[in-house]
């Protein structure tokens, strides 16, 4: 241990319909608690009981097994920021509370810790308004948004550049830096298929051995997820 205290405003472990964001967030949190680099993990969420139930099903993960996961109500956040020298806060996406948390940190925290997040969908119309809130004097050079691809990083940089120009923002105002952090694949959950398994899969779909196949990873929705079309 010895890595300080990790904080977040988001549960990362969510039920309901299966979306890519939820799968990625669950994978991140399970991997983090398996590696277990921090002394404690503080969650400030709107439904503490639901998150406690989710963690009860993962009590074999090292970070959870040793009791390092601490779950609080969002209402406890201000007092915790005043009293706790957090190592960092990491959020499950950049459009749900990152600028607001930075403002609270700057006002209350005894130590100015970095705040990070990672992008998921970036195509919704209201996202420009949400990203506008990221450009202000309270951002520090250690605050960051993880982009899951070079393309995502380019889009996010374009958002910020367009907002600066369109609103004539002060060039001295920072925005979170962009770091390209590709999504990982758990080799145990998705092992490389054997030649026999690959041939069987092709046969299942009536594909010849040398026939090219394009596999689309993602969710297809008529209203907001037809990028491939």
Regions found by a protein language model. Give the residues of each.
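Short catalytic/ligand-binding loop motif for oxyanion handling, primarily in non-cytosolic enzymes
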Residues: 14, 50-54, 97-100, 125-127, ...
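Extended catalytic core of nucleotide-activated donor transferases of GT-like folds
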Residues: 25, 48-138
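A short, active-site helix/loop in glycosyltransferases that binds the activated sugar's phosphate group
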Residues: 99, 129-200
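Short hydrophobic "strand-cap" motifs at the C-terminus of beta-strands
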Residues: 118, 148, 216-220
């Amino acid at each position: 241990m010895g890595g300080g205290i990790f904080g977040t405003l988001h549960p990362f472990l969510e039920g309901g319909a299966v979306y890519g964001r939820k799968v990625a967030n669950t994978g991140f949190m399970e991997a983090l608690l398996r590696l277990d680099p921090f002394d404690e993990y503080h969650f400030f969420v709107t439904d503490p009981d639901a998150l406690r139930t989710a963690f009860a099903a993962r009590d074999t993960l090292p970070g959870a097994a040793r009791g390092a996961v601490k779950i609080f109500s969002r209402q406890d956040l201000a007092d915790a920021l005043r009293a706790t020298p957090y190592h960092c806060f990491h959020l499950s996406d950049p459009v749900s509370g990152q600028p607001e948390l930075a403002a609270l940190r700057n006002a209350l925290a005894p130590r100015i810790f970095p705040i990070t997040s990672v992008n998921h969908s970036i195509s919704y119309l209201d996202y420009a308004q949400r990203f506008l809130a990221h450009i202000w004097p309270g951002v520090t050079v250690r605050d960051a948004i993880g982009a899951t691809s070079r393309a995502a990083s380019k889009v996010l940089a374009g958002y910020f550049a367009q907002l600066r120009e369109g609103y004539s923002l002060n060039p001295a105002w920072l925005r979170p830096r962009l770091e390209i952090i590709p999504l990982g694949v758990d080799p145990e959950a998705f092992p490389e298929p054997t030649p026999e398994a690959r041939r069987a899969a092709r046969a299942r779909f009536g594909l010849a051995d040398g026939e090219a196949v394009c596999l689309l990873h993602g969710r297809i929705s008529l209203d907001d997820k037809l990028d491939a079309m």
